[in-house]
A protein has these predicted regions:
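Cytosolic, membrane-interface loops and tails of multi-pass inner-membrane proteins
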Residues: 1-5, 9-10, 19-37, 170-186
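Interfacial segments of multi-pass membrane proteins
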Residues: 1-2, 30-35, 58-62, 80, ...
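Multi-pass membrane catalytic core of lipid/isoprenoid biosynthesis enzymes
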Residues: 30-59
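Alpha-helical transmembrane segments of multi-pass membrane proteins
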Residues: 43, 76-81, 117, 121, ...
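Membrane-embedded alpha-helical segments of multi-pass transporters/permeases
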Residues: 55-56, 86, 122, 139, ...
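Membrane-helix interface "capping/anchor" motifs
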Residues: 87-90, 119-133
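Loop-to-transmembrane alpha-helix initiation sites
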Residues: 111, 127-135, 145-160
Length: 186
């Protein structure tokens, strides 16, 4: 009678034991806002600080580049977050890193892109939609503010976000993606 009932759902797993690293962060209690909120805030703070540090370092290392130093510092933070060498190139999806970078590089319009993506999440309930929208909106904004090089780098970032959130977008299309703020969307 001490044996577990195999018909019951599996209990939540720790992040390191997840089979799919893309799902690990998405389903972790800290990132989903349920359960370990303090851990989630620490992860968010770490993402914000490492992105700010990367941008600051590039600004200090090459001040003659001006805003372009922030452009490449942020891209480095996004790449390092999504594919960290110390974790066998398996990382997160980069939403907080991307938002921080946009706000540092395009302070007002970057914040508006983030707000638009957040609004899409609140209205639809789908996190992948907001994540991809944030990065996609930044491409024309960067073009208008700083030109082609900036737009190209933002397009690279948008492509990364699309790739990292592709599975969630496909689940959305099939009606299988869980909705964030589910209680608001019945």
């Amino acid at each position: 009678e001490g044996a577990e009932d195999p018909s019951q759902e599996n209990p939540p797993q720790d992040i390191p034991s997840q089979e799919d690293p893309d799902q690990a962060g998405t389903n972790s209690e800290g990132s989903s806002g349920s359960g370990l909120r303090a851990a989630g805030f620490l992860v968010l703070a770490g993402d914000v600080l490492k992105t700010a540090a990367a941008c600051w370092f590039c600004w200090q290392a090459a001040p003659e580049l001006g805003h372009t130093a922030l452009l490449y510092g942020g891209l480095g933070a996004v790449l390092g977050h999504n594919w960290p060498f110390w974790n066998k190139f398996r990382g997160g999806k980069g939403v907080a890193v991307n938002c921080t970078w946009l706000i540092l590089y395009l302070p007002i319009t970057g914040a508006l892109c983030c707000l638009a993506g957040g609004g899409a999440v609140l209205l639809s309930g789908y996190l992948p939609l907001g994540a991809v929208l944030i990065a996609a909106l930044a491409v024309p904004v960067a073009w208008l503010q700083y030109g082609g090089e900036s737009a190209f780098i933002m397009a690279v970032s948008a492509s990364i976000m699309l790739t990292r959130h592709w599975a969630g977008l496909q689940r959305m299309r099939r009606g299988e993606e869980p909705q964030f703020f589910r209680k608001w969307h019945y």
